[in-house]
Amino acid sequence: MKVLVINCGSSSLKYQLLDMETEKVLCKGLCERIGGEGSCITHQVGGNKMKADAPFPSHTEAFAKLVEMMTEGEGKVIDSINEIDAIGHRCVHGGEKFQKSCLVTDEVIKTIDELSPLAPLHNPACLLGLKASREVFGMDKPNVVVFDTAFHSTMPPKAYMYPLPYEYYQEYGVRRYGFLGTSHKYVSLKAAEYMGQHPKDLKIITCHLGNGSSIAAVKRGQVVDTSMGMTPLAGLMMGTRCGDIDPSVVNYLKYSLGITGHELDEILNKKSGLAGVSGVPSGDKRDIEAAASAGDKRAQLAQDMLNYQIKKYIGSYAVAMGGVDCLVFTGGIGEHDAQLREAVCEGLDFLGIRINVDKNQNCHGDVCDITGWRGDVCVLVIATDEELMIARETKQVVEE
């Protein structure tokens, strides 16, 4: 079976074609600036990368172009569109309606649209991809939608409810949903596989740390709590997002600064977090680390705050699960920032978390075990693969 994995933005389309017999990536690429000037496609087969300018008035033309790149010329990996057995789409928000991946129908599209107020930037983009895919591939080709929120749907009410008037949950769906679930699921399963144990026998804390960051408590294969909330703004401080703050700060700033709700939303989402504290506009952890090394005290403070917050979540989730067997670091920062991993794990001996400093500094491969001597908790650095997880889910849904 060959599965095409799609991740749509409002003006972009990221894709990957996988042969599920071997789980090998046949090709991958990115269509950019859809609906605007200078639209183009970058198509990669192995180490060979091709770029072509092409007009993409909509996602439909982008789909048609990626099919052309796959079936013709230098980037050809299949003979025809018929070799693609199914298309798997990433969707950020499934709300309470979608607790697992499902086949796309008119009713599913309608429901995803109804959930758009919960993810106004992401769900409409997913819908553009779903509709364009059906246009290009035809209505008979199976399309499967995989939700970022689905893996977190096992959280109990005591973890997902907010202490607000209950009718706000009933009428408006105000509750914790959690995000980046596809990554959390992939690395938790990978960790269990590495440890040679069934997921149902383990208590795992997964730390997906990147420009967007999320931590999850996975007990016996099910999420019991996670750091992100009703939106991906909650939880840890991130590259440019504030994470958890006192809710009263929002109104205080709105009136003190004399700004609109939209302007405040921009500050909380795009000018806060590591960027806001450090003064490094990019919010990129590498830039902040460099600034801290050069003696920038605000950059150092931003790093200290992030490390401290991650520690707190690890401690609280260990308590929530009654212990921890495995701690996983993943995501752009989690996989590549040895300094952060060491700082986070320092002082967690009482939980049985100890790392080998040399292994931590020389971390390579899909799974890197950095557990230290006499460490009771397996500490792993795992390269996440959300596309592969979406492809697996798609294959499973189609075969069912």
Residue ranges and their predicted role:
Residues V3, S12-P57, G229:
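Short glycine-rich, Thr/Ser-proximal phosphate-binding strand/loop in the N-terminal lobe
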Residues M70, K76-H122, P142-V144, A150-A159:
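Short beta-strand-loop/turn "lid" adjacent to the catalytic site in phosphate-handling enzymes
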Residues H89, L121-P124, P142-F147, I205-C207, ...:
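General beta-strand structural signal in soluble alpha/beta enzymes
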Residues F151-Y255:
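Glycine-rich phosphate-binding loop of actin/hexokinase-like ATP-binding domains
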Residues V187-K190, Y194, L301-G322:
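Phosphate/ATP-binding catalytic cores across multiple sugar-kinase/actin-like superfamilies
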Residues L257-A302:
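A mobile "lid/hinge" subdomain adjacent to the ATP/sugar-phosphate binding pocket shared
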Residues D325-G347:
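Glycine-rich phosphate-binding loops at beta-strand->alpha-helix junctions
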Residues D366-E400:
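Structural signal for terminal/edge beta-strands and the immediately following C-terminal loop/tail
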